[in-house]
């Protein structure tokens, strides 16, 4: 619909150039066509006249009137009016929305998919949990947001690579190995000899028992076997990391989350990428030595203070491998790099960008982009869920999926802005009622499937071509409300991709489901008149298609029965 109006406005601008209202060399401005906040102001509005007023040396409202007069006639536009300082509002005819139903039917699964990315490359990194324990609900929110964001970007024409970064070279891994070793030697977290910074969750005992039993773990095709020797710390380290990575992969698979690339922090050291990044920074002239340490002049690039890169003992601070890792993303050809992180990591944003800018390699400012999510509180029976002992103080993603469903967990972890704190209500997520948004949306899809089955049981032969030809019959308030929502879907997908906010898809699906349920309750679908029945079934099938398309972007199933 926007394309139709942009074409009409473009023709109007050409007419104003032809009659001298606009100078002949006036270029069409980058005007917007958008939906007003309220329907009283029409279906769409444009600011074209306000942008052209200076070139025409005219009052914006006066130019808006001239542009309005110059617009060609269209059967899809019933009224055009001027509002405010020079906006032009368009009211569309039912035929415009009825035609959109035909577009949904014709394009099917591709309806709503766009070409904004034009095949350009984008790397989306998310979850990136340390392989030191089970995935908790915070990791789950990262997984849901990151995976849905990757799906939305793919729907917008980007060549998306999904990436998981394993921090397998830090002090946490050493603490993990020492904790498993202590368990293997018969100690408990309350024992006097327990490691000072050891992990206390019951899962550590599971790892130790598997190691002592000589179990073999498949870590993405590499088999790692426990040697049963509690004194072999290096063997314990390898086995524990493999065991917990395997556990995390199991949970992510159950959550319908997968990755194209698993990148190990340890490979940065093994392949010399950390040293390469350090040498590039030294060569750039943005480093200095002080107190036996190597510093980055990160204040030259927006940081609040300079940062130590290499400590006096020769070891690197944690942000250096982060810079090296993101340098590899640039070297791998990502035009965009997007990292989804917990909000507690916000301090690393500026220093990583500063390190990349200091290399003077032409990396754009603001690269990489970040999406930060806030914490999740889990509630049951109106009370906060006690932290799980097995995970050592966290509610695990696995527990949530088992108590509710992958669909419910994904929906609720996506459905609010990432930067807002989220309360996950287990009782609501399990409820089969209209108060549960994922149930409400999925039921709309299942309801269409049910109507189609009923039509078949009654012996009605649904003729979709006939239904498309008879859509003009559906000009009542509730039918048009559904059509309007269907027409919004491509815009919502595009905006969600631009803003990196997949929650907008969830909000939209609730609104579409509401319009559909309202229409269904106010309009008998399986009527005797074949023309009217086919038209209504066609509208229902179009709704079913858009619901399925949107749910797929969220990684939520579209059930046929409920």
UniProtKB/Swiss-Prot annotation:
Its EC number is 6.1.1.19. A motif ('HIGH' region) lies at residues 129-139. SMART domains: Arg_tRNA_synt_N, DALR_1. GO terms for molecular function: arginine-tRNA ligase activity; ATP binding. GO terms for biological process: arginyl-tRNA aminoacylation. Monomer. This is Arginine--tRNA ligase. The lineage of its organism: Bacteria, Pseudomonadati, Pseudomonadota, Gammaproteobacteria, Lysobacterales.
